[in-house]
Design a protein with these regions (language model features):
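Extended helical regulatory/linker subdomains that flank P-loop NTPase cores
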Residues: 1-80
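Extended amphipathic alpha-helical scaffold segments
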Residues: 12, 57-59, 75-175
Length: 175
């Protein structure tokens, strides 16, 4: 079972039990995985923070970089969850990008860019109704392949640029 699948099924983005991940690996894969974890490049081993005592702590795995975790979650949602269960994707996307959720800031841009670049109109229509869409659009439309930019995108960019908010260009687009 993948680390991302575990996170989604257990509604946690931290502290995946190392023992849980290892039980799905062959001995050769375990050796490679252990060496990979020892380097702390993309994943790292930690001790469970909530358990006390020298013999009660278990090793857990966390992502070294939250943005890499968020990228993998967005990819898993759009490439694995959505084709099999659109309603589940919709519920998770809304939950994970709701105001105050710890994934919102990192996950929303990846959902936007991946949905747009993969031309997933069903997902694009769904996320375009979410409260974060306009802000993410302004910041990340530039990451979309030029051939995928629509006339609606151009019109929205023009309206943003023509807005009469003082300092908008400097604050939002340049800085």
């Amino acid at each position: 079972m993948s680390i991302v699948k575990y996170m989604l099924e257990n509604n946690t983005v931290f502290n995946v039990p190392l023992s849980h991940l290892q039980k799905h690996l062959t001995e050769k894969e375990k050796n490679i995985f252990e060496r990979f974890l020892d380097e702390n490049i993309l994943l790292r081993k930690d001790l469970t923070p909530e358990r006390k005592g020298p013999f009660s702590r278990n090793e857990v795995v966390n992502f070294t970089y939250d943005s890499f975790r968020d990228y993998l979650i967005s990819t898993y949602l759009l490439d694995v969850v959505e084709p099999n269960n659109y309603l589940k994707l919709e519920a998770l996307a809304k939950e994970y990008t709701a105001k105050g959720h710890q994934l919102r800031e990192g996950l929303a841009p990846f959902l936007f860019v991946h949905a747009r670049n993969s031309q997933n109109n069903k997902v694009i229509n769904m996320i375009s109704c979410l409260d974060w869409y306009a802000d993410v659009f302004e910041m990340f439309i530039w990451d979309i392949d030029d051939v995928l930019i629509t006339q609606d995108d151009i019109a929205l960019v023009k309206s943003i640029l023509a807005s009469d908010q003082p300092g908008y260009m400097a604050n939002k687009l340049i800085l």
